[in-house]
């Protein structure tokens, strides 16, 4: 599921980046909402998480009580928001949606919590970006369904406890490691969403094509799925752009050839890599000899913020086997060199393999 800063002169639009960035653009929210499944049995992929959620929801319905608080983690675009909506629908209860950046003070959180009705679902996106005072208030709310409101200042201040209606919090995060331990521990169920397999993405593309009344062949759906970086949101976005190409420059039917031609226009290659991805690999290989290089150095080399490189480009590059992380920084793999059409030197291959083995044997997070 990123806003560009305003400048005096509009920047050039990177069409490929708009397609591949899994953070939804505001003008696409309505279309994406229309394509979302409404029930758990309509949700494609993430079978393990679906089975676990089904058990939790069935148990809660049998007891007539709200389910435990739920934490959903994983890269953007994998269905965290959709699953939160589905949980509320399966429980036949309202859902209130907010986000961590919108909760900057304890009072902001108190205002939201005190408006919840019994059994309501509160979806808190980007929960890792919530302000610390609000986090501390949330501990008590999650555990005892109560908030303590401080009235007054100084020695004369008093604390007024406010009882809350029992509710279910669903938190979503792309950065689980940034959540304090006490907050993580208060979630009764934690699920990590993984990148999707091509077969599941093909099913998603076919379903979305039916909803959009788009004619598509099996190999056309497979081609779009193959370039979708394991992410349903990107698959749906690519489908809509390929549909435009099919209607304007072809006969309206999305075939493999039409999908390939359309995605070439948007500079999305056969692996789903776009201009930023290739810039990261190019910097690592051509400028730094394959690494190791720190995140900040890579970001400067490609002209992006470190957060953009880390959250948008790197997750899929790691998964696709183009990058590895070592205690000394990022390194390009042999696959990255070959993807750029360059034969990797033996010393680079040896260093990358050694770094990989060190990280694997250590069993510790790398830098």
Curated annotation (Swiss-Prot):
The protein's enzyme class: hydrolase
Binding of ATP, residues: 35-36, 77, 80-82, 143-145, 186, 196, 233
Molecular functions per Gene Ontology: ATP binding; ATP hydrolysis activity; four-way junction DNA binding; four-way junction helicase activity
Keywords: ATP-binding, Cytoplasm, DNA damage, DNA recombination, DNA repair, DNA-binding, Hydrolase, Nucleotide-binding
Main location: cytoplasm
Biological process according to GO: DNA recombination; DNA repair
Cellular location(s): Cytoplasm
Sequence segments annotated as region (Small ATPAse domain (RuvB-S)): 197-267
Region annotation (Head domain (RuvB-H)) ranges: 270-367
List of residues binding Mg(2+): 81
EC id: 3.6.4.-
Signal peptide from the UniProt entry: none
CDD domains in the cross-refs: AAA
Gene3D superfamilies: 1.10.8.60, P-loop containing nucleotide triphosphate hydrolases, Winged helix-like DNA-binding domain superfamily/Winged helix DNA-binding domain
Pfam families: AAA_lid_4, RuvB_C, RuvB_N
GO CC annotation: cytoplasm; Holliday junction resolvase complex
Chain segments carrying region Large ATPase domain (RuvB-L): 2-196
UniProt binding sites for DNA: 325, 330
Catalytic activity: ATP + H2O = ADP + phosphate + H(+)
Assembly description: Homohexamer. Forms an RuvA(8)-RuvB(12)-Holliday junction (HJ) complex. HJ DNA is sandwiched between 2 RuvA tetramers; dsDNA enters through RuvA and exits via RuvB. An RuvB hexamer assembles on each DNA strand where it exits the tetramer. Each RuvB hexamer is contacted by two RuvA subunits (via domain III) on 2 adjacent RuvB subunits; this complex drives branch migration. In the full resolvosome a probable DNA-RuvA(4)-RuvB(12)-RuvC(2) complex forms which resolves the HJ.
Domain remark text: Has 3 domains, the large (RuvB-L) and small ATPase (RuvB-S) domains and the C-terminal head (RuvB-H) domain. The head domain binds DNA, while the ATPase domains jointly bind ATP, ADP or are empty depending on the state of the subunit in the translocation cycle. During a single DNA translocation step the structure of each domain remains the same, but their relative positions change.
The protein's role, per its UniProt record: The RuvA-RuvB-RuvC complex processes Holliday junction (HJ) DNA during genetic recombination and DNA repair, while the RuvA-RuvB complex plays an important role in the rescue of blocked DNA replication forks via replication fork reversal (RFR). RuvA specifically binds to HJ cruciform DNA, conferring on it an open structure. The RuvB hexamer acts as an ATP-dependent pump, pulling dsDNA into and through the RuvAB complex. RuvB forms 2 homohexamers on either side of HJ DNA bound by 1 or 2 RuvA tetramers; 4 subunits per hexamer contact DNA at a time.
Protein name: Holliday junction branch migration complex subunit RuvB
Organism: Acidothermus cellulolyticus (strain ATCC 43068 / DSM 8971 / 11B)
UniProt lineage: Bacteria, Bacillati, Actinomycetota, Actinomycetes, Acidothermales
Gene: ruvB
């Amino acid at each position: 599921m990123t806003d560009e800063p305003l400048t005096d002169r509009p920047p050039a639009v990177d069409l490929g980046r708009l397609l591949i960035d899994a953070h939804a653009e505001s003008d696409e929210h309505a279309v994406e909402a229309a394509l979302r499944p409404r029930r758990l049995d309509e949700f494609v992929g993430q079978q393990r998480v679906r089975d676990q959620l089904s058990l939790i929801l069935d148990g809660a319905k049998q007891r007539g009580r709200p389910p435990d608080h739920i934490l959903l983690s994983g890269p953007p675009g994998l269905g965290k928001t959709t699953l939160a909506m589905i949980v509320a629908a399966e429980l036949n209860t309202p859902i209130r949606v907010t986000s961590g950046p919108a909760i900057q003070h304890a009072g902001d959180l108190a205002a939201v919590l005190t408006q919840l009705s019994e059994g309501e679902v509160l979806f808190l996106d980007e929960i890792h970006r919530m302000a610390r005072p609000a986090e501390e208030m949330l501990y008590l709310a999650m555990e005892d369904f109560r908030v303590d409101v401080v009235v007054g200042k100084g020695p004369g201040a008093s604390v007024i406890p406010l009882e809350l209606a029992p509710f279910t919090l669903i938190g979503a995060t792309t950065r689980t490691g940034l959540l304090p331990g006490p907050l993580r521990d208060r979630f009764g169920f934690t699920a990590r969403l993984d990148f999707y397999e091509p077969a599941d993405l093909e099913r998603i593309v076919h379903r979305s094509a039916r909803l959009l009344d788009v004619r598509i062949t099996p190999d056309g759906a497979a081609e779009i799925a193959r370039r979708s970086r394991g992410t349903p949101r990107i698959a749906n976005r690519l489908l809509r752009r390929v549909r435009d190409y099919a209607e304007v420059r072809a006969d309206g039917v999305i075939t493999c050839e039409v999908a390939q031609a359309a995605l070439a226009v948007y500079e999305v290659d056969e692996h789903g890599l776009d201009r930023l991805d290739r810039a990261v690999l190019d910097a690592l290989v051509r400028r730094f000899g394959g690494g190791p290089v720190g995140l900040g150095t890579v970001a400067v080399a490609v002209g992006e913020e470190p957060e953009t490189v880390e959250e948008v480009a790197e997750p899929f590059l790691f998964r696709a086997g183009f990058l590895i992380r070592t205690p000394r920084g990022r390194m390009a793999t042999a696959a990255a060199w070959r993807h750029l059409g360059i034969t990797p030197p033996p010393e680079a291959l040896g260093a990358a393999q050694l770094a990989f083995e060190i990280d694997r044997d250590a069993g510790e997070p790398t830098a």
